Amino acid sequence: MITDIFLYPFMQKAFIVGILLSVIIACLGTVVVHKRLSLIGSALSHSSLAGVAIGLLLGFSPVLGAVGICVVAALCIEAIRKRMPAFSELAVAITLSVGIGLAGVLSGFVKNSSDFNSFLFGSIVAIDSFELIVVLILSSVVLLVFLLMYKELFYVSFDEEAAALSGVPVGLVNFVFTVLTAVTVSVAARTVGALVVSSLLVVPVAAAIGGEESPTGFHTT
């Protein structure tokens, strides 16, 4: 029977990780789309490949390398957005270009290309216990943040100036959201691949909007 596949531990891990990532990526995607940063997933996922290459070259976990580089890239995007608010899309374009360039150069020095390709195309059935624990912790943090900061996140995503005038700590909200997005994208790249993460971040949200511009309208379409 088809349910027999869930008797295998690796399929159980893949099933759990797939469900958890689909939930938290969708949550983050709603804010990403309304902040007009739909390509941030592509920029971060390609930047994570540079972190993977660094991890493989220096002999430590490529997942940690991907997370570290992704966080740095996300903070760079936020810094450029603050410096040039009228051209915020340039932040994503610049980071995407640098990330692809670094990944391309560093990948040439990686001896075992199969490890690097596993992040490029993903391998959800190859998830180990450590990565499962990382996804469980990350999912808990993302869901907790959305429960506690739901209104603030969407207020900032629509109008940062109005949110600041209303007393919302815009800098803190943006920092927390940026770091969570970076970590989620880098971890998801290991399961579904860096080439697909950006689609998971944007396409489901675009389909859910269905002409509604309000995030609360997703549920009524």
Predicted regions and their residues:
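The first (N-terminal) embedded transmembrane alpha-helix
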Residues: 16-28, 41, 45-46
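Short juxtamembrane and helix-loop transition motifs at transmembrane-helix boundaries
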Residues: 1-9, 23-34, 51-61, 152-162, ...
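Helix-loop-helix "hairpin" substructures at the membrane interface of multi-pass membrane proteins
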Residues: 131-204
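Short loop segments and helix-boundary regions at transmembrane helix junctions
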Residues: 30-112, 209-221
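Structural signature of hydrophobic alpha-helical transmembrane segments
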Residues: 11-22, 58-72, 136-140, 186-201
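Transmembrane helix-bundle core of multi-pass membrane transporters
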Residues: 4, 9-13, 84, 92-151
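Hydrophobic alpha-helical transmembrane segments
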Residues: 15-20, 63-68, 91-94, 132-137, ...
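Generic alpha-helical transmembrane segments of integral inner-membrane proteins
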Residues: 19, 23-27, 68-76, 102, ...
